């Protein structure tokens, strides 16, 4: 992953001049460069797109990563609470809010479009440590998600350290049913 790619990713979401955000991406790149997180995040992003996003709950070291969020691996944005305009990319941070999802509606002061309220103020330092990404899926989607993951990694000619693939773990991604749900494994 190059610095140009990270800059382009920043500008696509937040516009030109969002250098503190770009700086955070560079720091996350440095923290994740030598581990297995990036391939897992790409896989998780593709899985969320394939299964409609909201039916796949991503847990673990993904939710505090801006890079994972911008790649689409998690809906959780770890930046401090803010508004961003999807139309003109105008950005406003709100230092008084506890969480971006609680911000009131706001029209963009630049173009008048409705702004997106986002941000949960999560630090990237907790990316250091064990690289675990856990996925929770509804019971009726468990088998299709397992099959999709096997196909995804098989197409990339990847091997795992456990032969054959487990029913609950594929290439470091742990699959679980929501708490209290019985069956499937």
Language-model region placement:
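Alpha-helical scaffold/interaction cores of sigma-54-like transcription cofactors
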Residues: 1-185
């Amino acid at each position: 992953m190059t610095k140009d790619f990270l800059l382009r990713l920043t500008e696509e979401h937040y516009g030109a001049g969002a250098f503190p955000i770009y700086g955070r991406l560079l720091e996350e790149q440095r923290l994740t460069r030598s581990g297995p997180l990036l391939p897992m995040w790409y896989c998780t992003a593709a899985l969320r797109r394939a299964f409609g996003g909201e039916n796949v709950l991503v847990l673990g070291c993904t939710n505090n990563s801006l890079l994972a969020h911008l790649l689409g691996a998690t809906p959780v944005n770890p930046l401090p609470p803010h508004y961003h305009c999807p139309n003109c990319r105008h950005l406003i941070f709100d230092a008084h809010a506890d969480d971006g999802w609680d911000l009131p509606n706001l029209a963009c002061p630049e173009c008048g479009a409705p702004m997106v309220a986002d941000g949960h103020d999560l630090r990237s330092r907790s990316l250091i440590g064990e690289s675990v990404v856990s996925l929770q899926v509804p019971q009726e989607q468990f088998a299709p998600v397992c099959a999709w993951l096997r196909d995804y990694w098989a197409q990339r000619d990847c091997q795992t350290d456990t032969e054959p693939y487990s029913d609950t773990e594929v290439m470091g991604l742990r699959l679980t049913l929501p708490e209290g749900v019985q069956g499937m494994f």
